[in-house]
Amino acid sequence: MIMNFNMEEWEPRTQLGRLVKEGVITSIDEIFEEGHPIMELEIIDALLPDLEEEVIDVNLVQRMHKSGRKVNFRVIVAVGNKDGYVGLGQGKAREVGPAIRKAVDDAKFNIIKVRRGCGDWGCVCGREHTVPFKVSGKSGSVRVTLIPAPGGVGLAIGDVGKTIMRLAGIDDVWSHTRGQTQTTVNFARATFDALKQLSKVKASEKDLKNLGVCST
């Protein structure tokens, strides 16, 4: 589902928000590069207007309270523009609808830029269709390793991973998993963590070019 946002109705509450609305800042990359904290969801909506959301998991959570048993819904949501930006978030509420909205907001605040490239040695297409190099992420007992794949392979990963990859704009990937991968939450978080690790690997401009990674 694509989310709607009305720029005209937005009244920024922060200096960063005002710079975005005034058109001084026109790219989310500018904010990421400067390391500015994003305090308004509207900043994400304005700079990434084509974000889509997907519910990854809905779970009923019970806990004991002095007034009795409390029941909440815990929802995991992924958002992305299918072109290099993806986020993962969690929301809790007594009803599913509010829990989803909280999870969407949390996912927006967790948006990252995903490094993509043509990292498989057998593929020289030069498109940013896969991960540029092997990378791993973990959450709890789950460890997910993403491996570059040539064009046409598709997403060789579990359904939860497929959703996150698709929203990130990755078309082809091999994967290897360990741990309790049937635990949806940890599988999603480990996959997202692997994508985050892509940006933490230091590489020269020459190496990035060889891997088909766009430096802009």
UniProtKB/Swiss-Prot annotation:
InterPro entries associated with the record: Ribosomal_Su5_D2-typ_SF, Ribosomal_uS5, Ribosomal_uS5_arc, Ribosomal_uS5_C, Ribosomal_uS5_euk/arc, Ribosomal_uS5_N, Ribosomal_uS5_N_CS, Ribsml_uS5_D2-typ_fold_subgr
Transmembrane portions of the chain: none
Record key words, sorted: Ribonucleoprotein, Ribosomal protein, RNA-binding, rRNA-binding
General function of this protein: With S4 and S12 plays an important role in translational accuracy.
Domain notes: The N-terminal domain interacts with the head of the 30S subunit; the C-terminal domain interacts with the body and contacts protein S4. The interaction surface between S4 and S5 is involved in control of translational fidelity.
Complex and partners: Part of the 30S ribosomal subunit. Contacts protein S4.
This protein's name: Small ribosomal subunit protein uS5
